[in-house]
Amino acid sequence: MKVYAAPFEKFVNLADARLGTRILSVTDDWFADANRLFQPTPAVWKEGVFDDNGKWMDGWESRRKRFEGYDSAVIRLGVAGTIKGVDIDTSFFTGNFPPSASLEACFLASGEPDENTAWTEVLPSVELQGNSHHYHEINNDQAFSHLRFNIYPDGGVARLRVYGVPHRDWSKVSADEQIDLVAALNGGRSIACSDEHYGSMSNILNPGRGVNMGDGWETARRRTPGNDWVIVALGHKGEVEKVIVDTLHFKGNYPDSCSIQGALVKGGTDSQIETQSLFWRELLPSQKLTMHAEHEFAEQIKAIGPITHIRLNVFPDGGVSRLRVLGKVAR
């Protein structure tokens, strides 16, 4: 099992480039493009690589400041949401990292921030070290759509991860509209799995199809009896009508078969839910899978009523690129 550096790492990274997160404005990114902050892959070091502005760095890096002030970047999150925690990652920035940083946020139903926008401080100034991860829990139940990331006074940051719960106005979803109940953009999140040796369990809920094997969930080769599994919390309680299991890019390492269980969970912690999931009702009986393909199951879905969680079982192990659970919202 993967060991998380902070409990909130299991939540959706709202600042993931794959969700559409992007820089709206930045005071200075002379040495390194600020949009690199949102790349889903870990930062890398390229020895001896320089461009016209200096040493190539995998992150956001501003010039050395020769006047008063500090640098900042205004960010539009790919999906608005409630922030549970952040990771300010200064990997490979050693003599050029900012001594401190802070984070502000706002929520706009439409449009972009301007000079009249009221910002809320969600992370007061915190000290930073070079080549390090800095995990900070955020205690604020508001939903935010934009961030202002401040570094004092200048320097470089490799990655900014903003973990939280995506926000969606479910009152605007009609009773007869079929939606993906587990999509990250709709608030779905992977909460536990048996193993994620090669790829994160959260990848299977991302929009679009996977770009490669690394952009999916893949377990280690199982050398003991049993099977691998992942538990997903739906963005909203709903009734399932169709499931899509996509093994794109997985050719010699796709699962032989899969099944899905579901449950209407009321209360409990993630660890308690994990323990109980073995006894959930069968939503999708065991189905054969093939390599590098989308598998749609509709007629095979059992009518078990409204559910809040599903458990995808893969037999015996292997990789899945994406999981879609289509259905209607249950009020």
From Swiss-Prot:
Recorded catalytic reaction(s): these are: allantoate + H2O = (S)-ureidoglycolate + urea
Q: Which UniProt keywords apply?
A: Hydrolase, Purine metabolism
Q: Report the pathway entry.
A: Nitrogen metabolism; (S)-allantoin degradation; (S)-ureidoglycolate from allantoate (aminidohydrolase route): step 1/1
InterPro entries, A to Z: Allantoicase, Allantoicase_dom, Galactose-bd-like_sf
Annotated Gene3D superfamilies: Galactose-binding domain-like (2.60.120.260)
Biological process per Gene Ontology, one example term? purine nucleobase metabolic process
Q: What does the record give under GO molecular function?
A: allantoicase activity
Q: Which Pfam families match?
A: Allantoicase
Q: Which domain of life is it from?
A: Bacteria
The EC designation for this entry is 3.5.3.4
Q: Does the keyword Hydrolase apply?
A: yes
Looking up PANTHER family in the UniProt record yields: ALLANTOICASE, INACTIVE ALLANTOICASE-RELATED
- Name the HAMAP family for this protein: Allantoicase
What family does the Swiss-Prot or TrEMBL record give for this protein? Belongs to the allantoicase family.
Protein's name according to its UniProt entry: Probable allantoicase
| Organism for this UniProt entry | Pseudomonas syringae pv. syringae (strain B728a)
Source lineage: Bacteria, Pseudomonadati, Pseudomonadota, Gammaproteobacteria, Pseudomonadales
Gene this chain is encoded by:
alc
